[in-house]
């Protein structure tokens, strides 16, 4: 195994993410795993993802662990995702904006939109698509997607870069999976108003 950890970011990474990443890097070093880290910044996330994918292919990495810079994850994330033996496997995480829906999708249809998972099986399960906050891909998958599309992450007319990749992969016959034992936090910035404090006091006094 030769692992590339790819982190696309706009301009900065969250401190809590850095703590999680540091623990993971120390664990990989202790276990003598051959790895490299690529933090790629830019205003267009899909281009950052493209550059990470190209490095993985050009430098002959076997896998890419994709981590967004606003994620919180456990130090065993890699071993749990690797245990699936799949070319594509994600952990579970939810959107950081109000509504907080799952970023794991049952279906993606241009005329209907996306259907999110509301509940999760207890074992590894197949999905239609997902966000790329905490995904492990094989370079074999990346090379096939790139070979047939001349891109991995360029957005499609109705799909962002992460779901567009998922569609390209499934169109080639690859199956996408989710490992429910990997649950990540999604760091959000929620404005707090005085009424939020009042609502909180009511919950602790009820």
What residue spans do the PLM features occupy?
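N-proximal low-complexity "stem/linker" segments adjacent to membrane-targeting elements
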Residues: 1-43, 47
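Residue-level recognition of beta-strand->loop/alpha-helix junctions
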Residues: 38-41, 92, 180
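Active-site nucleotide-sugar/metal-binding loop of Leloir-type enzymes
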Residues: 50-63
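Conserved catalytic core of nucleotide-sugar-dependent glycosyltransferases
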Residues: 53, 74-154
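Short beta-strand-to-loop acidic/aromatic patch adjacent to the donor-nucleotide binding site
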Residues: 60-72
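C-terminal catalytic/acceptor-binding lobe
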Residues: 144-206
């Amino acid at each position: 195994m030769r692992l590339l950890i790819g982190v696309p970011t706009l301009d900065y990474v969250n401190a809590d993410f850095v703590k999680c990443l540091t623990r993971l890097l120390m664990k990989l070093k202790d276990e003598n795993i051959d790895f490299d880290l690529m933090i790629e910044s830019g205003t267009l996330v899909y281009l950052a993802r493209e550059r990470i994918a190209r490095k993985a292919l050009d430098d002959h990495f076997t896998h890419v662990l994709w981590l967004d810079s606003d994620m919180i994850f456990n130090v065993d994330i890699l071993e749990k995702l690797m245990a699936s033996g799949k070319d594509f496997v994600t952990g579970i995480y939810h959107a950081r904006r109000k509504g907080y829906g799952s970023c794991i999708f049952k279906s993606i249809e241009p005329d209907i939109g996306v259907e999110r998972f509301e509940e999760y099986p207890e074992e590894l399960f197949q999905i239609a698509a997902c966000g790329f906050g905490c995904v492990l891909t094989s370079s074999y998958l990346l090379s096939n997607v790139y070979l047939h599309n001349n891109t991995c992450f360029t957005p499609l007319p109705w799909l962002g870069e992460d779901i567009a990749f998922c569609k390209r992969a499934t169109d080639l016959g690859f199956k996408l999976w989710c490992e429910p034992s990997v649950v990540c936090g999604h760091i959000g910035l929620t404005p707090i108003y005085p009424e939020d404090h009042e609502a909180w006091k009511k919950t602790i006094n009820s």
